[in-house]
Design a protein with these regions (language model features):
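Structural signature of tandem-repeat unit edges
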Residues: 1-38, 44, 49-65, 74-88, ...
């Protein structure tokens, strides 16, 4: 059967009410092309492509929607031509197309669904057009060969896990239009050396840069009020962090395992330092905790073996369990009268002079050195 040519309407309102999901009725009434790919009766939706398809495939002119899972697990598909009539790429549309090497997304596309290209391990480069406004969660997760990517100014949000596990990605430019970066967005991008978070970003999700081992420096803009837990966990090459005014809390394990971190500026706006926030930051030799901080969480600076001195401000009331445990170079410390609670083993393994140690024991008991 010859597939009829569909003339794409120029009226964007034609897409109103169209879904990337496939109904039973649509599937049963589908038109089949010469490759056994199924299209909706009106030719505006590509429903499903057979697993046997290999090599190169050209989507028919006039298609508006590439439906959810349309190309799922097509392991032999190498290249694809998407016509400029397409406006939406559905969820998991090309998931696990492991041989897909090249792809051009036309200017007509406005949205890329969740996990759309997840696991496309052979995809090396990609240009996202200016028409796209959102990149779904996990959209390019596991694209381990993707080396470069340009995100256009039209995009306002990067979904959770969008580029998770893109091991070959070395550089990415986040445009000023971005306001949010989802959880795990760049997790495991081991060779990403440089990334700038634009001033317009107001939220960065948990684990967003976990394991970005080549990232050397980062600046947190003042629009962000909270550094979420494990945002920079195990960024082993991260040596410098600038946190601008506006951030009020540093979350649990936020910089844990950042073993090259030697400089961090905490602004006066921060009121709490979470559990394990700087645990294992071996190179951190000094830290100024601002007067605004009222609590230091469990394990907050545990294992910071290069830390030689620290000033705890007058408004701190509690220091958590093991907060400074294993800070073997810490030789001087002043704890203000405002502190009423120090957790167990808070200073275990610290080599204080005897007079300082005895003074602390008299105030808080031997448990703090246990």
């Amino acid at each position: 059967m010859q597939y009829p040519t569909i003339k794409a309407s120029q009226d964007a309102s034609d897409n109103l009410g169209m879904s990337t999901k496939v109904t039973i009725a649509e599937f049963n009434e589908a038109i089949t092309d010469e490759f056994c790919a199924k299209y909706s009766q009106d030719g505006r939706k590509l429903l499903k492509v057979p697993y046997e398809l290999n090599g190169t495939y050209s989507i028919k002119e006039g298609v508006r929607i590439i439906c959810d899972e349309a190309f799922l697990d097509l392991c032999s598909l190498r290249s694809l031509v998407i016509p400029d009539s397409v406006t939406s790429i559905g969820e998991r549309a090309f998931m696990c197309c492991k041989s897909l090497e090249s792809l051009v997304i036309p200017d007509s596309v406005t949205s890329i669904g969740d996990s759309a290209f997840m696991g496309c391990g052979s995809l090396r480069s990609l240009v996202i057009p200016d028409s796209v406004t959102s990149i779904g969660g996990g959209a390019f997760s596991g694209c381990k060969s993707l080396e470069s990517l340009v995100i256009p100014d039209s995009v306002t949000s990067i979904g959770g896990g969008a580029f998770r596990g893109c091991y070959s990605l070395t550089n990415i430019v986040i445009p000023n239009s971005i306001t949010s970066i989802g959880a795990r967005a760049f997790e495991g991008c081991e060779f990403l050396t440089n990334i700038a978070i634009p001033d317009g970003v107001t939220s960065v999700g948990e684990y967003a840069f976990w394991g970005c081992n080549s990232l050397t420096n980062i600046a947190i803009p003042d629009g962000i009020t909270s550094i979420e837990k494990r945002t920079f966990l195990d960024c082993k090459s991260l040596s410098s962090v600038v946190i601008l005014e506006g951030v009020t809390s540093i979350g649990d394990d936020a910089f844990m395992g950042c073993e090259s971190l030697n400089s961090v500026i905490i602004p006066d706006s921060v009121t709490s330092i979470g559990r394990g926030a700087f645990w294992g930051c071996w190179s951190l030799n000094s830290l100024v905790i601002p007067d605004s901080v009222t609590s230091i969480g469990d394990d907050a600076l545990r294992g910071c073996t290069s830390l030689t001195d620290i000033v705890i401000p007058d408004d701190v009331t509690s220091i958590g369990n093991r907060a400074f445990r294993g800070c073997t170079s810490l030789s001087s410390l002043v704890i203000p009268d405002s502190v009423t609670s120090i957790g167990e083993s808070a200073f275990g393994g610290c080599n204080f002079p005897n007079d300082i140690e005895q003074e602390l024991i008299s105030r808080f008991g031997e448990k703090i050195f246990g």
